[in-house]
Amino acid sequence: MQDELVWIDCEMTGLDLGSDKLIEIAALVTDADLNILGDGVDVVMHADDAALSGMIDVVAEMHSRSGLIDEVKASTVDLATAEAMVLDYINEHVKQPKTAPLAGNSIATDRAFIARDMPTLDSFLHYRMIDVSSIKELCRRWYPRIYFGQPPKGLTHRALADIHESIRELRFYRRTAFVPQPGPSTSEIAAVVAELSDGAGAQEETDSAEAPQSG
């Protein structure tokens, strides 16, 4: 297995694999030290009015507030094209199939939609997954000081921004949880959060200036 991680986040019209649609997918590849490789990719796919009108109110409000619904309506990208765009980016940094684990937050849900709609992408990834949410849950039980000191989550509910948050969160756990006991003090945890937050602000500015086109 290689050291790269493939981070993916998806936005859907809901969580029902039987009826809901995949409408946005973003991907970033990192090395073993969680350094981001390349610019990443963020693709919004078209969905028809029937799919969008079937969203429950909370999801419809979330995607309206983020601007995603308008982008979905305007998009001409289908699932096959989006899958090819994501694979083109990943192939720049991961040369061998089935070597790079999928990483993200609550990633099993995303992978289920990927397996349904983008089987070539799914089969390219290693079967193992790195779910940052699992580390969060373990910290809540074993290291509450770290859990309650974690960086605040954003509320953009957009795929690329969510990946950046997930990477930042794993960087946080690497520096606070994956260390010899007794671990960092409360003030040391706060210092890590402040440093990571400063970096996140700079990254958001870069994303805004150089966001990949959706097609």
UniProtKB/Swiss-Prot annotation:
Active site (record annotation): Y127
Chain spans, region Disordered: 196-215
Places the protein is found: Cytoplasm
GO molecular function: 3'-5'-RNA exonuclease activity; nucleic acid binding
Domain Exonuclease intervals: 5-170
Cross-referenced InterPro entries: Exonuclease_RNaseT/DNA_pol3 (IPR013520), Oligoribonuclease (IPR022894), RNaseH-like_sf (IPR012337), RNaseH_sf (IPR036397)
Pfam family membership, one: RNase_T
HAMAP family: Oligoribonuclease (MF_00045)
Family listed: Belongs to the oligoribonuclease family.
Cited PANTHER family: OLIGORIBONUCLEASE, MITOCHONDRIAL
Role summary: 3'-to-5' exoribonuclease specific for small oligoribonucleotides.
Protein name: Oligoribonuclease
Species, as recorded: Mycobacterium tuberculosis (strain ATCC 25177 / H37Ra)
